[in-house]
Amino acid sequence: MEVKIHSKHIDANLKTAMHAMCGYALSRLGISTRLSNNINLNIHMRHAEHEGESYIHDDANSKRPRDFVVVLDHHQMNRDEYGRKLTDTEWGHKILETLGHELVHVKQYLTGELTGGAEAGLYWKGTRFKLEDFRDYFETPYEIEARGRERGLLIGFLVQWNDMQPALDEYLKNN
């Protein structure tokens, strides 16, 4: 898997965690090593309409996509649902959780469950979902799965991350 993170002013430790989260999440979502070795993820940290979005890269094969773009608007992630400012650690966790959510959509594209795009419309297992308003978005099967998996992916990742963090810190200190 090739992961490119395009960002400014993002801590190296968070970037490393984002790389690790990509591998962890796709593995937990049942994507084989063989398939994940052929995936390209371009993660852009920039202003966007939503906190996160993922889509098939314009140049990718739409029938068997392997190139994906994930956009994370980290500027929108500095406050919780109630408007409280997040600490740096909470902000990093929010970024990783949103990345996990978007990687569920990548899995859906890879397995053919989710097809189409913004212009053609999104299809879940062959059924087109026409959204009348934003409330309908949260009722789509692809969003229900992504919302349902995002927290579990974050917690599972953080358990592994905390276990390997001392060894990683030692490695970075010596190299």
Predicted regions and their residues:
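Auxiliary, metal-adjacent structural segments of Zn-dependent hydrolase domains
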Residues: 2-69
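Hydrophobic (often cysteine-bearing) scaffold residues that line and stabilize catalytic clefts
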Residues: 14, 18, 92, 96, ...
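Short alpha-helical scaffold segments that flank and stabilize functional sites
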Residues: 25-28, 107, 149, 153
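Active-site scaffold of zinc-dependent metalloenzymes
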Residues: 48-94, 106-110
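Post-HEXXH active-site segment of zinc metalloproteases
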Residues: 93-97, 109-139
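Active-site recognition of the HExxH zinc-binding catalytic motif
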Residues: 97-110, 146
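Substrate-binding/catalytic groove segments of enzymes
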Residues: 106-122, 154-165
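Long, well-structured alpha-helical subdomains associated
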Residues: 132-175
